[in-house]
């Protein structure tokens, strides 16, 4: 594509993370701005290398997190800047057969498994919390015939003693659950539908109408126009921590 259309200014990469590095490296080397869909790569190190290359070439690299652009996210962030959170509960459960039918790459090493949706929740939590959190313990459930987990149960904290828990599961049928609940001294924040709905102290909030992807591309254009990059790897770092610190539990084989 780069050879056939040398006049393009930017590319957006949405292929599986195991194959992202080569495409991004080629585009950056050719002097193109690069928008990477989440997750930005299969490893932290390869994305860090791409960030250095973008800086050397003077082009923009945007490691995007689409869920951070959900309508409720900035409202929650502003509220938590004023009212310290004491507890966070994340429930991110969906049906993998519905959302990823026949996609074998997602079960391979580097495909993230249940962390493919779970990283969306982590991208929101790392955006809204006033302090950085870190993993304390976790259990990752691997089907006997797969190299990536189908479920994860994670416990986090931060320097203030925050209690944060996340439950990810790819086996939920029927209604899907993309929820984050945050306890504060001014009431509970309850986010639902991946950030499309929000209640504060039981009161439904009016939220911006702009969708995630129009907001994402507007931000990308702003980065390009101002000569900046945006490469926040904190959600991916939490996933790496989970694989490093979490206990592995083998469960029944899973066929998609």
Which residue ranges define each predicted feature?
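C-terminal helix-rich "cap/oligomerization" subdomain common to oxidoreductases
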Residues: 9-13, 159, 219-256
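Rossmann-like dinucleotide-binding domain that binds NAD(P)(H)
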Residues: 101-174, 234-238
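A contiguous active-site-proximal alpha/beta segment in oxidoreductase catalytic domains
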Residues: 18, 41-99
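NAD(P)-dinucleotide binding in Rossmann-like oxidoreductases
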Residues: 144-149, 160-224, 228-233
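Hydrophobic residues in well-ordered beta-strands that form the structural core
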Residues: 36-37, 61-63, 191
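A general structural signal for well-ordered alpha-helical segments in protein cores
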Residues: 20, 24, 47, 73, ...
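Beta-loop-alpha module in the N-terminal Rossmann-like domain of NAD(P)-dependent dehydrogenases
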Residues: 1-35, 39-51
């Amino acid at each position: 594509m780069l050879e056939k259309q040398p006049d393009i200014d930017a590319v957006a990469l949405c292929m599986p993370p195991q194959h992202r590095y080569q495409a991004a490296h080629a585009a950056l080397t050719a002097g193109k701005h690069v928008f990477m869909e989440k997750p930005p790569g299969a490893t932290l190190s390869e994305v860090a290398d791409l960030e250095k290359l973008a800086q050397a070439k003077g082009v923009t690299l945007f490691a995007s997190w689409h869920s951070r652009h959900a309508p409720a996210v900035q409202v929650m962030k502003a509220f938590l800047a004023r009212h310290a959170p004491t507890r966070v509960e994340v429930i991110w459960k969906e049906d993998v057969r519905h959302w990823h039918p026949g996609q074998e790459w997602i079960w391979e090493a580097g495909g993230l498994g249940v962390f493919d949706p779970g990283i969306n929740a982590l991208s929101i939590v790392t955006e809204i919390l006033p302090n950085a959190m870190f993993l304390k313990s976790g259990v990752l459930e691997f089907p006997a015939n797969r190299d990536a987990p189908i479920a994860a149960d994670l416990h986090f904290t931060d320097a203030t003693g925050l209690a944060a828990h996340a439950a990810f599961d790819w086996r939920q049928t029927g209604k899907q659950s993309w929820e984050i609940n945050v306890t504060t001294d001014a009431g509970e924040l309850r986010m639902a539908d991946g950030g499309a709905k929000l209640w504060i102290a039981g009161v439904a909030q009016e939220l911006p109408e702009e969708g995630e992807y129009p907001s994402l591309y507007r931000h990308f254009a702003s980065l390009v126009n101002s000569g900046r990059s945006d490469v926040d790897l904190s959600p991916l770092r939490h996933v790496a921590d989970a694989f490093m610190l979490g206990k592995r539990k083998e469960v029944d084989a899973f066929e998609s």
